[in-house]
Amino acid sequence: MSKVIKFVKKEAVLFISLAAALISMIFTPPNPEYLGYVDWSTLGLLFCLMAAVQGFGSIGAFSRLAGTLTRRFHSTRSLGAALVLMCFFLAMLVTNDVSLLTLVPLTIALFRSLPEICIRTVVLETAAANLGSMATPMGNPQNLYIYSHFSMPVADFFRVTLPPTALSLALLLLSVLLIPRSKLSAPESPENAADVPAGASGKRMKLRAALFSAAAAVSLCTVLRLLDWRVCLVVVLVCVLTADWRVLKRVDYALLLTFICFFVFVGNLSAVPAVRELISGVVSGREMLVGVLLSQVISNVPCAVMLSGFTGNAEQLLLGVDIGGLGTLIASLASLISFKLYGASAGAKKARYFAEFSAYNFAMLIVLFAAQTGFNALSA
C-alpha cells in the first residue's frame, strides 16, 4: 500500500488528469470518437525525443560535458553563472527536465559546503531551464504540443519565442550577479551521475553514441516537418533497441498518459456546446493571461493541452504557458524536479529554498508578463 501511495504522490498530475477524464465521461460517454481526441503525432514525436535524450543520458554524455565545463571555473559566482547559463542553453536542445536532471545533482555536489550559494544557484538553474526551453519546439512538452497541434510554421514559432527568450537571458545575467563570490574548494562527485556500464568497450560506446545521434537527428527532422512522425517512430525504435533496449525504461510514460487523459478531458468538454461556448468565451482574447494564471494551479503542460481545445490563438497561448512556467512550484513540473533533488540532499533547507524560489520566480514572471503585454499592445 505504501508503494501505491508513493507512486500516486510522485505522479500526482497523472492521477488528477485521469480523474478529470473520468469525470468528463459523465457528459460524453465513451465512444469511438475518443480516438480522434488524441493528437497521436505529438505523442509519437514526444516519445522519440525523450528516447533519444535518455539514450545520451545513458552513456553519460551530459554529465561528461557538464564536468568538463565546470572544471574551468575557480570562483563560486563564475561557476554558478556557468551552471545557470548551461541550463538555459541545454534546455533548448534536450528539454528543461533533462538539463535539470543533469546539472542540479552536479551543482549540489559542487556547493555542498556552501548552502546559501547552493540554493541560489539551483533556484536560478530552474528558472533558466524553464526560460531557455521556451526558445525551441523541442525545449519542453507544451512547446512541442502547441507547435504540432496548431501546425505552427517554424518562422512564426521563433518570431514569438525569441524576444521573451532574449529578455529572459538578460534577467538571468543580472540575477547571477547575486550569487556570492568566494573561492571554490575541490568538488565532490555528483550523487546522481549518469550510469555508464562498467567495462563497456570504446567501440561499443561509439556505436551507441552514433545510434542515439541518428535517433536525435531523425527526431529533429520530424520537428522541422521533413519526415512523417511514423517514420521517425520506427527509426528511433530500431536505433534504441539496437543500442540499448533499457533506455526505453527511462522514457517518461506518465507524461504521455497525462497527455492522453487531458486530450480525453478536453475532447469531452468540447463535445458539450454550452460548456465549449462558456470556456471559449473566457479564454478568447485572454489566452496569455489565462495561460499564466491556470499554469500556476495545474502546471503549464496540462494547461496547454486544456486551453488548446478552446482557442485558435496559438501564439498567445504559447506565450502564456511558457511565461506561466514561472511562479509557483507546480507551475512547471521541471521545477518540482529541482525541488525533489535538492530536498533529498544532506542538510537541505527546504523552507529557505521555497522562499528564494518564490521570490525569483514571481519577480521574473511579473517582468516578462508586463514586457510581453506591452509588446502585444504596441504590435496590435
Residue ranges and their predicted role:
Residues 1-16, 75-76, 201-211:
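N-terminal membrane topogenic signal
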Residues 2, 116, 155-203, 336-380:
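Juxtamembrane and boundary regions of transmembrane helices in multi-pass small-molecule transporters
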Residues 2-33, 44-60, 178-181, 218-246, ...:
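Structural signal for alpha-helical transmembrane segments and their membrane-water exit/capping regions
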Residues 4-10, 32-42, 152-164, 201-204, ...:
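Interfacial loop-to-helix junctions that mark the boundaries of transmembrane helices
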Residues 13-14, 40-41, 67-81, 119-127, ...:
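Cytoplasmic-side transmembrane-helix entry/capping segments in multi-pass membrane proteins
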Residues 37, 59, 63-66, 213-312:
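Transmembrane helical segments that form the transport core of multi-pass membrane transport proteins
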Residues 40-42, 71-84, 112-121, 206-210, ...:
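Membrane-interfacial loop-to-helix junctions in multi-pass transporters
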Residues 83-85, 89-134, 145, 305-319, ...:
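Hydrophobic transmembrane alpha-helices that form the pore/transport pathway of multi-pass ion
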